Amino acid sequence: MIEADRLISAAVINDEESIDRAIRPKLLTEYVGQPHVREQMEIFIQAAKQRGDALDHVLIFGPPGLGKTTLANIIANEMGVNLRTTSGPVLEKAGDLAAMLTNLEPHDVLFIDEIHRLSPVVEEILYPAMEDYQLDIMIGEGPAARSIKLDLPPFTLIGATTRAGSLTSPLRDRFGIVQRLEFYQVADLEHIVSRSAKCLGLELTPEGAHQLARRSRGTPRITNRLLRRVRDFAEVRADGAINGEVAMKALDMLNVDAEGFDFMDRKLLLAVIDKFMGGPVGLDNLAAAIGEERETIEDVLEPYLIQQGFIQRTPRGRIATNHAYKHFGITREE
């Protein structure tokens, strides 16, 4: 199964980006959850503005769908500067990055999503740009080639990644501010989905918001997607209002259970329980058993299952916990 086909995927699906932009918070005062990140960024931004400096470079990492792009937009808005957006895979050549850097205004924010996917050649260009606000470029070819230095205006690089461990040490060490985004609490997601419903002109009761929030895997992007699908159900099968009962019926129909698990989550858990006696099972064997790539299991399926205590990683492999057995009503054999 392709990850983007899953309703509870944290990846961006189809035209969601334009909808997300419309309901995205613009300022830190509107930003819900991540209290430590919010408090720290308030201080760092205010201090930079008081000094008249560009904000230090920021690395934001964590699972997909938690608001890394949203936070980058908020930082630029709070600093009162332009935001230039790109991604690691798009910057194929050094010239691609050089063109973006030379078009920055003083204190602008350059946001690079999936920064762990930068090519080594492009990454080398970033080092002097981040450290000294200088751009080293080669003019000409062969024996006549020469290096020239261009001064850049002070700017802020914001890098976002789901795989901070894949960043090289020289790049990681050049970020003065490092923020990890955690899965959201249900209460925060209730606040987020209520705000989104208001922006979309939907009637959502507190009970409806709770049902959506608790099945959203701690991820705002999933919360907002479920809201749109439950809206469809409410308009066709009810009077358009989303209360607790309507939300439960809609989410059950969509095959999203009370823990926010879908078919793939249940398939993984049952594979560990049934095919491997609860584990431990190695990642390659587990990937073969459910027909998924190991990277998909590591980056997409496992993080939430581990965070919720349904799977444990051990030196010998993955183990299904008592929570997993209880979820399926299976008695664990000792």
Curated annotation (Swiss-Prot):
UniProt: DNA binding residues: 294, 313, 318
What residue spans carry the region label Small ATPAse domain (RuvB-S)?
Answer: 185-255
Q: Which GO terms describe its cellular component?
A: cytoplasm; Holliday junction resolvase complex
KW Transferase (keyword) present: no
SUPFAM superfamilies, A to Z:
P-loop containing nucleoside triphosphate hydrolases, Winged helix' DNA-binding domain
EC assignment: the record states: 3.6.4.-
* Top-level taxon in the UniProt lineage: Bacteria
Cellular localization per UniProt: Cytoplasm
Q: Which GO terms describe its biological process?
A: DNA recombination; DNA repair
Could you tell me what reaction this enzyme catalyses? ATP + H2O = ADP + phosphate + H(+)
S-S bridge residues? none
Example of a GO MF term:
four-way junction DNA binding
State where Mg(2+) binds: 69
- Span list, region Large ATPase domain (RuvB-L): 4-184
List of residues binding ATP: 23-24, 65, 68-70, 131-133, 174, 184, 221
Q: HAMAP family from the entry?
A: DNA_HJ_migration_RuvB
Q: What does the UniProt entry state concerning the protein's domains? A: Has 3 domains, the large (RuvB-L) and small ATPase (RuvB-S) domains and the C-terminal head (RuvB-H) domain. The head domain binds DNA, while the ATPase domains jointly bind ATP, ADP or are empty depending on the state of the subunit in the translocation cycle. During a single DNA translocation step the structure of each domain remains the same, but their relative positions change.
What this chain does, per the entry, is described as:
The RuvA-RuvB-RuvC complex processes Holliday junction (HJ) DNA during genetic recombination and DNA repair, while the RuvA-RuvB complex plays an important role in the rescue of blocked DNA replication forks via replication fork reversal (RFR). RuvA specifically binds to HJ cruciform DNA, conferring on it an open structure. The RuvB hexamer acts as an ATP-dependent pump, pulling dsDNA into and through the RuvAB complex. RuvB forms 2 homohexamers on either side of HJ DNA bound by 1 or 2 RuvA tetramers; 4 subunits per hexamer contact DNA at a time.
Give the family, as the similarity comment puts it: Belongs to the RuvB family.
Stated name of the protein: Holliday junction branch migration complex subunit RuvB
Question: What lineage, starting at the top, does this entry show?
Answer: Bacteria, Pseudomonadati, Pseudomonadota, Gammaproteobacteria, Enterobacterales
